A protein has these predicted regions:
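A conditional alpha-helix N-cap/helix-loop micro-motif detector
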Residues: 1, 87-88, 178-182, 207
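Gly/serine-rich nucleotide phosphate-binding loop at the start of the catalytic core
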Residues: 1-107, 115, 121, 281-285
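SIR2/sirtuin-family catalytic core signature
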Residues: 1-19, 25-27, 101, 122-124, ...
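Flexible, glycine/proline-enriched loop segments at strand-loop-helix junctions
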Residues: 82-85, 172-180, 198-201
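Electropositive nucleic-acid engagement tracts
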Residues: 114-116, 124-127
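A short secondary-structure junction signal
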Residues: 118-120, 162-168, 210-214
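Active-site gating loop/helix substructures
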Residues: 126-194
């Protein structure tokens, strides 16, 4: 695959990598009738402003708009609005490839259930997906299950809207304020990140909160594996900067990247099948 070293590609295809999905990974998704579509953080902010603040405060941050809206209308209506716009979204081609690859873990700051639906739609996924939203979920047993892949939902999930202990987090900046009942999720991710490469998809590196999140996960730069940053907006200077921080940069969308991975996976399986057949022929002789 272009822009990705053979070593990191093999790490991914051999099941040693962590997939980390942001809002950009859901952008190409939509509901069956086309009424609802995946949103960026800014689009979600504008939606909340239109619904609760008469279109005002769009120049403010998502974190600020979320706090003001929750104070004005309470948490419930905000959660219901998000649920309305995400619950009917369908997995993209990119999502459908995820269950075909073995992962050390999958982490996401998205609230939607696109990954869950992708595994449900696959009749023979490589692993059994186990969702983890809070500290009360059985994290250790999931991590010790060789057939399971943990899905760490760092900012909450629309499946838990009625759980007042786990409110949806509207930005990475808010994570430190709402870590109560989520400490194990982030500590688990950081432990895994120390020994396994992370593939970041769907994050805009121009977003300061996202940069903080990435550096928080990968703070020990010189002692961790190289990571992968997939972002179609990457320019020459961005690639130079992130490369100096032990990232391999791929200027593709999430769907484009996953399609490329799927092609690499198919090539590997074809080579393996040929090798097995040749071995069988040798034994027959």
């Amino acid at each position: 695959m272009e822009h990705l070293t053979e070593y990191l590609l093999n790490q991914i295809l051999n099941g040693n990598a962590i997939l980390f999905l942001g809002a950009g990974a859901s952008l190409e998704s939509q509901s069956e009738d086309g009424k609802y579509k995946g949103m960026t953080g800014n689009q979600l902010k504008d939606l909340i402003c239109d619904e609760f603040l008469s279109g005002k405060s769009k120049n403010k941050s998502l974190s600020y708009v979320g706090a003001v809206t929750k104070d004005l209308a309470s948490t419930g209506p905000v959660h219901e609005l998000i649920n309305k716009h995400t619950s009917e979204l369908l997995p993209t081609v990119g999502h459908s490839i995820i269950p075909k690859i073995r992962w050390k873990a999958i982490a996401t700051t998205n609230y939607d259930e696109l990954v869950e639906k992708a595994y449900k739609n696959n009749s023979k996924p490589i692993q059994i997906l186990k969702r983890i939203v809070g500290d009360n979920d059985d994290i250790q047993s999931i991590l010790s299950d060789v057939n399971a892949v943990p899905l760490l939902k760092l900012h909450g999930c629309i499946s838990r809207l009625n759980d007042h202990q786990l409110p949806l987090i509207l930005s990475s900046h808010d994570y430190h304020k709402f870590r109560l009942n989520r400490n194990s999720l982030f500590s688990t991710l950081k432990e895994l990140a120390y020994n396994h490469p992370i593939v970041f998809c769907g994050y805009s590196i121009s977003d300061e909160n996202i940069r903080d999140l990435i550096f928080d996960v990968s703070e020990i730069k010189n002692e961790r594996p190289k990571y992968v940053l997939v972002d179609p907006t990457l320019e020459k200077q961005d690639i130079s900067y992130w490369s100096s921080n032990r990232f391999e940069c791929i200027p593709l969308t999430f769907v484009q990247f996953m399609k490329s991975l799927g092609e690499e996976l198919n090539d590997n399986m074809a080579k393996l099948s040929t090798a097995v057949k040749n071995t069988a022929i040798t034994f027959k002789k």
